[in-house]
Amino acid sequence: MSAWGYAALLAIPLAAAALRCVRPWFALNAIVSLSCAAIVLAVRGAVSPLFFGLIVSVAADWFMAHKAGRTGWYLCGIGGFFAAHALFLWDVLLDASLAPLPFLAFALLAAGYGLYLARRILPRVSDARMRLAIVLYMLISAASLGFSLAAPGAARTLGLLCIVLSDTLIAESDFAGNRAAGAWILPTYFLCHILLALSAVVERGM
């Protein structure tokens, strides 16, 4: 199949994402991520860290969607997404040039986002385990996004930027009391996975 044929398959996660935004069915979340993972697998012809990161995201998303105020489940969700980001970072590092730029980008992102968390989010989080999980997750997110700047493909960087934005919206909604932010969590999350799948298609050559 040509790269354009694989790109056409992105209609599957796009349709599932659009339907999920109007119907509260978790199965649609899984369809978005799993179909993106299938596209990555088909395009690359072998399993890869990106493929496994998308698969792990399904389990992490399940815990987040069903946490219902349970801190333990919330922590499982964060832990799952931490693992997914570690896999995304691994995938980035396979292509990235370890020049000074990504290290500088990581440092700036970690410092800026750390300041945001310290001032707006962490003071509102009473559970010490949750605070630690949030900080560690911020660091892996900053690393995957920062190092993506040294790897080819704007779609991958934009995808990782979308997941950071989605996570920020979750923090705003769950900890800062900004309920309006919740409306954009799923669209940005789904866009992340679709862009990551697109990045694999672009690698093939469009």
Q: What residue ranges belong to the model's regions?
A:
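Polytopic alpha-helical membrane-helix bundles and their juxtamembrane interface segments
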Residues: 1-206
